[in-house]
Amino acid sequence: MASVGPVKTKTVTLKELTPPIPSPEKSACKGAKPDSNHMALVPVKPSQPGSGKLITRTRLQRDSLISQQQRDALVVSSFGIGTTRHGQPDNTTSSIKDGFSTAAGGVNCASVVVAQSEKDSVRFHLCVDALAEGCVNTFIHLFHLSHRDPVCVDQLAQTLFTIPDEKLVWVKSQLAAVEVLRRQSEFRDVCERCQLLADYFESERDCDEAAWHYDVALRIAMESLDRPLEQEVRLSFGAFFERHKQLRKAIALFEEVYHLAMALNDVETAVEANYRLIRTYLSLSAELKDTNPKEAISFLERALDMSQRVKSSKDEADSLHALGNIYESMGDFRRALEYQKRFFEVARAANLVEREKRASLCVASMQERMNMTDEAVHSLQCALELSEKAADIEGVYRATMQLGQAYDSSGDHEKALMSYRANFGAARKLNNSDLTDQARVALGFALGEHYLKHAGGGRGYVPIVCDDVKAQLEWMSNGIL
């Protein structure tokens, strides 16, 4: 049996048993071969309860709608950085050049920050004072008035209107008084303040703003249930539109006044509304007579009806005269003559001398155009008598001129010559060169016609020139032919 020799033992440490972990640099090197003598240790994943797989959740990264620079701008505008009341504004927002964009559009940062010059202005302090007093409506309207663009009040002269600072203080006080008095139910005082504001803006020719204050007064008067106050405001509002030639709006307001007055049995207000309606109807018909004569006739008929209702002879005569003129311009001479005759009758019955003279001339003109010569002569003689009684030289001039033309049309040249002589004398008394020249020409033609047929005791001008030398010499020496 062989003997066993002594066994050799070697002590091995834990460090020697652990294989070296290759570094990332060495493993990433190109051409590096793994060491076959080393065993790679693979990390073991922790087990998940109920599942053998590891579920990983990734958080979605959303892009911000605004940049950090724009976010800073929002912070600046929200907290009022750079808008200190005292001292110079700080430069916190000086680095922000661009505005920030929102869903509503782009906003410039500079427009959000209030400038120091604006905070030192009168309009800024007035708006703040109105808001501090609790007058929110005053603040809103005053802000609009003080920050609006200059208003063009004259298109031809390009005149612009802006409320001066000293007047803006007064406007603010009136607006605040309107709001406070309305809360106290002092409705008449409110309307008086609105009237003052409307008068001021109308004097500056800012008619839109003046109309706005009239409208406010009317709405407050209607809320008050004070019918007399409501009627007064409507009449003032209508008169404003009448002054500025917005006649249809004026008519609408005056008609409301009339119907309400009739419902309340307020005779005095109804009569006042009637007179204003008549005047407005006549003015509007004068504007429409060339462009829309049928509509003008409808307004004149309404004016005629109202004038007869209130028994106003002057307005009735004017309505009839205007109707006659429109029908004459339309070529309806029969109806024109009918209305002019009614015009003459109303004027004579009411002893309206001026209108009676004018009516006589109008009737005669229509009769002459319709070849009613005898009737025209009669009407003209009536007009001449009225003018002579009233010592109206201009009326005498017109009557004698038309009378001479009427006599010429009828073939009575002797009476025509007499009328033209009277016409020339009246023209010289008027000291009007144009009328004098016109009368001289008419008289010259009349004298020529007369001498052509009646010169030399009825022989005529042509036989005298051809045969009677003695008569020619007498004419040349004495001026008598």
From Swiss-Prot:
Null mutant phenotype: Defects in flagellar motility and cell mobility.
GO cellular component, as recorded: axoneme; ciliary transition zone; cilium; motile cilium
Q: Which Pfam families match?
A: TPR_12, TPR_8
Tell me which stretches of the chain form a coiled coil: none
Q: Which UniProt keywords apply?
A: Cell projection, Cilium, Cytoplasm, Cytoskeleton, Flagellum, Repeat, TPR repeat
The keyword Nucleotide-binding belongs to this UniProt entry's keyword annotation: no
Q: Where is this protein found?
A: Cytoplasm, Cytoskeleton, Flagellum axoneme
Q: Where is the composition biased (Low complexity)?
A: 1-18
Q: Does the keyword Cytoplasm apply?
A: yes
Annotated TPR repeat ranges: 191-224, 231-264, 271-310, 317-350, 357-390, 397-430
Any one GO BP annotation for this protein: cilium-dependent cell motility
At the top level, the lineage of the source is Eukaryota
User: Where are the residues of the annotated region Disordered?
Assistant: 1-53
Record's comment describing the protein's domains: The TPR repeats are required for axonemal localization and flagellar beating.
PANTHER family per record: TETRATRICOPEPTIDE REPEAT PROTEIN 29
Task performed by this protein = Axonemal protein which is implicated in axonemal and/or peri-axonemal structure assembly and regulates flagellum assembly and beating.
| Record's subunit section | Interacts with TAX-1.
- This chain's protein is named Tetratricopeptide repeat protein 29
